[in-house]
Amino acid sequence: MAKLTILEFPDERLRTKAAPVETVDDETRKLVDDMLETMYDAQGIGLAATQVDVHRRVIVMDVSDDRSQPRVLINPEYTPLGDEREPMQEGCLSIPEYYAEVPRALRVSLKALDRDGNPYELEADGLLAHCIQHEYDHLEGVLFVDYLSPLKRDRVLKKMQKRHRAMQDA
Protein backbone atom coordinates (compact mmCIF):
# COMPACT_ATOMS: atom_id res chain seq x y z
CA MET A 1 0.00 0.00 0.00
CA ALA A 2 1.06 3.57 -0.54
CA LYS A 3 0.03 6.86 0.96
CA LEU A 4 -1.35 9.22 -1.69
CA THR A 5 -1.12 13.01 -1.92
CA ILE A 6 -4.40 14.77 -1.08
CA LEU A 7 -5.22 17.76 -3.28
CA GLU A 8 -6.13 20.95 -1.43
CA PHE A 9 -8.62 23.68 -2.28
CA PRO A 10 -8.46 25.76 -4.47
CA ASP A 11 -6.76 23.17 -6.75
CA GLU A 12 -8.91 23.04 -9.90
CA ARG A 13 -8.47 19.26 -10.20
CA LEU A 14 -10.93 18.98 -7.31
CA ARG A 15 -13.57 20.34 -9.72
CA THR A 16 -13.20 17.43 -12.16
CA LYS A 17 -16.23 15.18 -12.51
CA ALA A 18 -15.20 11.55 -11.97
CA ALA A 19 -15.81 8.86 -14.57
CA PRO A 20 -17.44 5.51 -13.74
CA VAL A 21 -15.22 2.52 -13.00
CA GLU A 22 -15.66 0.14 -15.94
CA THR A 23 -14.15 -2.95 -14.30
CA VAL A 24 -13.23 -3.61 -10.69
CA ASP A 25 -9.78 -5.16 -11.08
CA ASP A 26 -6.48 -5.37 -9.20
CA GLU A 27 -5.70 -1.74 -10.10
CA THR A 28 -9.02 -0.62 -8.60
CA ARG A 29 -8.44 -2.69 -5.46
CA LYS A 30 -4.94 -1.20 -5.07
CA LEU A 31 -6.45 2.29 -5.39
CA VAL A 32 -9.00 1.40 -2.68
CA ASP A 33 -6.28 0.08 -0.36
CA ASP A 34 -4.07 3.14 -0.94
CA MET A 35 -7.03 5.46 -0.36
CA LEU A 36 -7.90 3.73 2.92
CA GLU A 37 -4.29 4.03 4.12
CA THR A 38 -4.25 7.70 3.10
CA MET A 39 -7.59 8.44 4.80
CA TYR A 40 -6.60 6.73 8.06
CA ASP A 41 -3.18 8.41 8.07
CA ALA A 42 -4.84 11.83 7.60
CA GLN A 43 -7.35 11.11 10.41
CA GLY A 44 -10.27 11.44 7.98
CA ILE A 45 -13.58 9.60 7.88
CA GLY A 46 -13.99 9.68 4.10
CA LEU A 47 -11.97 10.15 0.93
CA ALA A 48 -13.02 10.33 -2.72
CA ALA A 49 -10.64 9.36 -5.53
CA THR A 50 -10.95 12.88 -6.94
CA GLN A 51 -9.16 14.15 -3.82
CA VAL A 52 -6.08 12.09 -4.71
CA ASP A 53 -6.18 13.17 -8.38
CA VAL A 54 -7.75 9.95 -9.67
CA HIS A 55 -10.92 10.86 -11.49
CA ARG A 56 -12.84 7.61 -11.05
CA ARG A 57 -16.02 7.08 -9.03
CA VAL A 58 -14.43 5.52 -5.94
CA ILE A 59 -15.02 6.47 -2.29
CA VAL A 60 -13.68 5.01 0.94
CA MET A 61 -14.99 5.86 4.39
CA ASP A 62 -15.04 4.73 7.99
CA VAL A 63 -17.27 6.59 10.42
CA SER A 64 -16.83 4.08 13.26
CA ASP A 65 -15.36 5.33 16.53
CA ASP A 66 -12.60 2.71 16.54
CA ARG A 67 -11.82 2.92 12.79
CA SER A 68 -12.75 -0.74 12.30
CA GLN A 69 -15.50 -0.53 9.67
CA PRO A 70 -14.01 0.55 6.35
CA ARG A 71 -16.56 1.00 3.59
CA VAL A 72 -15.88 1.00 -0.14
CA LEU A 73 -18.27 2.68 -2.57
CA ILE A 74 -17.49 2.14 -6.25
CA ASN A 75 -19.82 3.83 -8.75
CA PRO A 76 -22.10 4.97 -5.90
CA GLU A 77 -25.59 6.32 -6.44
CA TYR A 78 -27.69 7.66 -3.60
CA THR A 79 -31.25 8.88 -3.20
CA PRO A 80 -32.48 11.05 -0.31
CA LEU A 81 -35.20 9.33 1.71
CA GLY A 82 -37.77 12.01 2.43
CA ASP A 83 -37.44 15.78 2.47
CA GLU A 84 -35.99 16.08 5.97
CA ARG A 85 -32.61 17.82 6.08
CA GLU A 86 -30.21 18.21 8.97
CA PRO A 87 -27.27 20.60 9.32
CA MET A 88 -24.08 18.95 10.50
CA GLN A 89 -20.58 20.28 11.02
CA GLU A 90 -18.38 19.18 8.11
CA GLY A 91 -14.69 19.28 7.46
CA CYS A 92 -12.66 18.01 4.54
CA LEU A 93 -9.18 16.60 4.03
CA SER A 94 -8.91 18.88 0.98
CA ILE A 95 -9.78 21.96 3.09
CA PRO A 96 -7.79 21.34 6.28
CA GLU A 97 -8.58 23.19 9.49
CA TYR A 98 -11.91 24.59 8.26
CA TYR A 99 -15.34 23.42 9.39
CA ALA A 100 -18.86 24.63 8.64
CA GLU A 101 -22.42 23.43 9.07
CA VAL A 102 -23.93 22.04 5.88
CA PRO A 103 -27.57 20.90 5.66
CA ARG A 104 -27.98 17.53 3.94
CA ALA A 105 -30.62 14.83 3.65
CA LEU A 106 -31.16 13.13 7.00
CA ARG A 107 -31.50 9.67 5.42
CA VAL A 108 -30.30 8.23 2.13
CA SER A 109 -30.54 5.01 0.17
CA LEU A 110 -27.24 3.95 -1.41
CA LYS A 111 -26.36 1.57 -4.25
CA ALA A 112 -22.69 0.84 -4.94
CA LEU A 113 -20.13 -1.83 -5.69
CA ASP A 114 -17.78 -3.15 -3.00
CA ARG A 115 -14.00 -3.67 -3.25
CA ASP A 116 -14.56 -6.85 -5.28
CA GLY A 117 -17.17 -5.38 -7.61
CA ASN A 118 -20.17 -6.95 -5.89
CA PRO A 119 -23.28 -4.74 -5.86
CA TYR A 120 -24.84 -3.83 -2.53
CA GLU A 121 -27.48 -1.49 -1.14
CA LEU A 122 -27.94 0.15 2.23
CA GLU A 123 -29.95 2.81 3.98
CA ALA A 124 -28.00 5.31 6.04
CA ASP A 125 -28.74 8.14 8.45
CA GLY A 126 -26.78 10.48 10.71
CA LEU A 127 -23.04 10.80 10.16
CA LEU A 128 -22.90 8.00 7.57
CA ALA A 129 -25.60 9.68 5.44
CA HIS A 130 -23.77 13.01 5.64
CA CYS A 131 -20.45 11.39 4.76
CA ILE A 132 -21.96 9.60 1.74
CA GLN A 133 -23.36 12.88 0.42
CA HIS A 134 -20.16 14.84 1.12
CA GLU A 135 -17.91 12.29 -0.61
CA TYR A 136 -20.35 11.84 -3.50
CA ASP A 137 -20.17 15.60 -4.07
CA HIS A 138 -16.41 15.23 -4.61
CA LEU A 139 -17.11 12.83 -7.48
CA GLU A 140 -19.25 15.57 -9.02
CA GLY A 141 -16.55 18.23 -8.55
CA VAL A 142 -18.46 19.89 -5.70
CA LEU A 143 -16.90 20.94 -2.38
CA PHE A 144 -18.72 21.57 0.89
CA VAL A 145 -17.66 25.23 0.75
CA ASP A 146 -19.86 25.57 -2.35
CA TYR A 147 -22.84 25.44 0.02
CA LEU A 148 -21.57 28.46 1.98
CA SER A 149 -22.28 32.12 1.35
CA PRO A 150 -19.90 33.87 -1.08
CA LEU A 151 -18.41 35.81 1.85
CA LYS A 152 -17.61 32.66 3.85
CA ARG A 153 -16.31 30.88 0.74
CA ASP A 154 -14.00 33.84 0.02
CA ARG A 155 -12.67 33.69 3.59
CA VAL A 156 -11.86 30.00 3.15
CA LEU A 157 -10.13 30.72 -0.16
CA LYS A 158 -7.97 33.44 1.42
CA LYS A 159 -7.12 31.16 4.37
CA MET A 160 -6.08 28.34 2.04
CA GLN A 161 -4.01 30.67 -0.17
CA LYS A 162 -2.22 31.95 2.95
CA ARG A 163 -1.62 28.34 4.06
CA HIS A 164 -0.14 27.44 0.66
CA ARG A 165 2.16 30.49 0.70
CA ALA A 166 3.37 29.57 4.20
CA MET A 167 4.07 26.00 3.07
CA GLN A 168 6.04 27.26 0.05
CA ASP A 169 8.08 29.64 2.22
CA ALA A 170 8.94 26.88 4.71
Curated annotation (Swiss-Prot):
Q: Which reaction does it catalyse?
A: N-terminal N-formyl-L-methionyl-[peptide] + H2O = N-terminal L-methionyl-[peptide] + formate
Molecular function in Gene Ontology: metal ion binding; peptide deformylase activity
InterPro entries the record matches: Peptide_deformylase (IPR023635), Peptide_deformylase_sf (IPR036821)
Q: Which keywords has UniProt assigned to this entry? A: Hydrolase, Iron, Metal-binding, Protein biosynthesis
Locate the residues binding Fe cation.
C92, H134, H138
Query: Which top EC class is given?
Result: hydrolase
Entry's transmembrane regions:
none
Cofactor requirement = Fe(2+)
Give GO terms for biological process: co-translational protein modification; translation
Has the keyword NAD been applied to this entry? no
Top-rank taxon of the source lineage equals Bacteria
Q: Which residues form the active site?
A: E135
Keyword field contains Nucleotidyltransferase: no
Entries under CDD domains matching the protein: Pep_deformylase
What is the protein's known function?
Answer: Removes the formyl group from the N-terminal Met of newly synthesized proteins. Requires at least a dipeptide for an efficient rate of reaction. N-terminal L-methionine is a prerequisite for activity but the enzyme has broad specificity at other positions.
**Protein name per its UniProtKB record:** Peptide deformylase
The gene it comes from is def
